[in-house]
Amino acid sequence: MAANVGDQRSTDWSSQYSMVAGAGRENGMETPMHENPEWEKARQALASISKSGAAGGSAKSSSNGPVASAQYVSQAEASALQQQQYYQWYQQYNYAYPYSYYYPMSMYQSYGSPSQYGMAGSYGSATPQQPSAPQHQGTLNQPPVPGMDESMSYQAPPQQLPSAQPPQPSNPPHGAHTLNSGPQPGTAPATQHSQAGPATGQAYGPHTYTEPAKPKKGQQLWNRMKPAPGTGGLKFNIQKRPFAVTTQSFGSNAEGQHSGFGPQPNPEKVQNHSGSSARGNLSGKPDDWPQDMKEYVERCFTACESEEDKDRTEKLLKEVLQARLQDGSAYTIDWSREPLPGLTREPVAESPKKKRWEAASSLHPPRGAGSATRGGGAPSQRGTPGAGGAGRARGNSFTKFGNRNVFMKDNSSSSSTDSRSRSSSRSPTRHFRRSDSHSDSDSSYSGNECHPVGRRNPPPKGRGGRGAHMDRGRGRAQRGKRHDLAPTKRSRKKMAALECEDPERELKKQKRAARFQHGHSRRLRLEPLVLQMSSLESSGADPDWQELQIVGTCPDITKHYLRLTCAPDPSTVRPVAVLKKSLCMVKCHWKEKQDYAFACEQMKSIRQDLTVQGIRTEFTVEVYETHARIALEKGDHEEFNQCQTQLKSLYAENLPGNVGEFTAYRILYYIFTKNSGDITTELAYLTRELKADPCVAHALALRTAWALGNYHRFFRLYCHAPCMSGYLVDKFADRERKVALKAMIKTFRPALPVSYLQAELAFEGEAACRAFLEPLGLAYTGPDNSSIDCRLSLAQLSAF
């Protein structure tokens, strides 16, 4: 059994190279050979071992005795000694355990021997074999030689997760051996199916064995083995044991020290690590930089005089240092002679501090470039050179550079934002970013990204406490989890609301920024701010003549009334003496001719001259009372309302006048307009002296009868109205008569005499009563229609 293992090691070596070389020929990948000279010696030795192993294979098929076993033991020992030459070669790439390029299976496990994971072989033998003797375990545990005949079937380890691709059947020369598992994650595409090369070998009973062709010189194996599609980011943390075969693949894991669930590097960036360099695994942490480079960065930020200079310097340093660390020149440059960025480079467009209304760059941060260490812990290892420790950490050495990380993506150049946008994803296939709304870029849409508005106040810069980076929120294991969840209905609504474009948004931002772009102090107002309430000329209202008081010089007694739209001319305004003469003239003209149009125009002209000159005296009260009486007599209640409103204001200034009379008129006017609110207010401010006034007492009694629906008392009071109260009651007397008529028709049966109705509703005569009843469409009865048929007229009550 041990001999079989030794034969497996030798044949696997040549088979692997035959397989890969065949794949390279098929794909047309003829690359120049760059290999160690020791490989050629190894292949020659292994070729001879393979031939002797093939000769001993026929004896194995007929006899499994100790002679064959001893032969294979010697072959295994020779293979193990050959392998020891390359064990140190693997160690320079920091592999903790021997590296296996292929599947970790013993070739002859299937003949009854247990596999590495305790599983039986995929096919059995006619004669079950016993496990190897304990003395051969050391040989089995020696580092394996890369390569194994893929035509031999195997059983996949139980710890491996199944691949997304189903198992591929073997080619016809190997039809008896079917793969029982999918390709291992991270292996080359050539390992997912059998090679179609010529198969010339000897048979072990029903099983066909292919002697591999000598590999063609070409590119080294680990440079040709690219990961299968969809498997570059997968990785499994299989428990490793010393000197045990592992399932690591150079195509998917460039560094043996990677954690099983750690961030994965890009396979295309790490497949060219054939040259040994001490800085092949660069880190973005300043602790890993050369001392000259650290001093250079400090000099750059020390030379900055303002925050804008720091922003510009930070942006330039990101470009320079990132390129130098990637190509390795950062360790060879004399940084003490390197000029500062501002001395040799022109300021890049948009290099000053970005305005907060400008959209930020939509570029995604590089994969693996945003893993920030938390609490000064160990930095997360990334495959991208110079991008492993790009984030800021509390209390780390970034404070030496002015709290600026020169490797952060230029997502926002504002120095006031302490936590920049960083990659919160855990795999290379996600590009979600998390940015705070207090960054200078107000919104950034990259693909399907949406940056919600959230926290406003940035954390204090340069503080090392636990609350200095509250925007990071969750731990390393939880970071980015919110992006992995499916968006809920509420979040979709919020995102839709954020994505709504406001056409005025940019204009508003520019106006808002224009107010703060100049840092000058606010100038104090030399004069107190006065709110002008008189600027209503455009709306058609009268100007405030209190500010335009003049003394008129016009001697004219009569003057046409015109609305003023500008400052009044004193030559067109009459003084008080002339206005008194004009008022007497208007009174006489009204008594003689009853020309309301002329009287109203002259009264309004007098009122205007008084207002322009700011005259509010006893004469002003007389003018308004005269105009109110003329309007009442003519029935112009609009003009009366203007006059009584001004009279109420003048009476409040304790100017003498007919206060009781016009208070009664005001109460009756409120009854006419059915303004119960103003009536209640007026009643509340009535003094005892006013209540004792005859006009006010009459108005209060009339209001009580109106409120109670007592039409009999109402019309009795109407007939005995003092002064000019009757003119106001005339405005709503017919309305109250209809209400009273409805009540009478409902009450009186079968007929209602017209004579009784005339007396009860306070008509002056029967003719006036008939004129009132005629348009109502009532039914009459009796001789000469002297009575109203209440039963027939009941249907007409709804019409009035």
From Swiss-Prot:
Chain segments carrying region Disordered: 24-66, 118-291, 328-506
GO terms for cellular component: nucleus; protein-containing complex
Transmembrane regions listed in the UniProt entry: none
Keywords: Acetylation, Phosphoprotein
A Pfam family of this chain: SAC3_GANP
UniProt biased composition (Polar residues): 124-142, 178-197, 245-256
Annotated positions of the N-acetylalanine modification: 2
Biased composition, class Basic and acidic residues, residue ranges: 32-43
Low complexity bias locations: 47-65, 412-427
Domain PCI intervals: 636-800
InterPro entries xref list: PCI_dom (IPR000717), SAC3/GANP/THP3 (IPR045107), SAC3/GANP/THP3_conserved (IPR005062)
PANTHER family assigned: 80 KDA MCM3-ASSOCIATED PROTEIN, LEUKOCYTE RECEPTOR CLUSTER MEMBER 8
Quaternary structure, from the entry: May be part of a SEM1-containing complex.
Name of the protein described by the UniProt record: Leukocyte receptor cluster member 8
Lineage: Eukaryota, Metazoa, Chordata, Craniata, Vertebrata
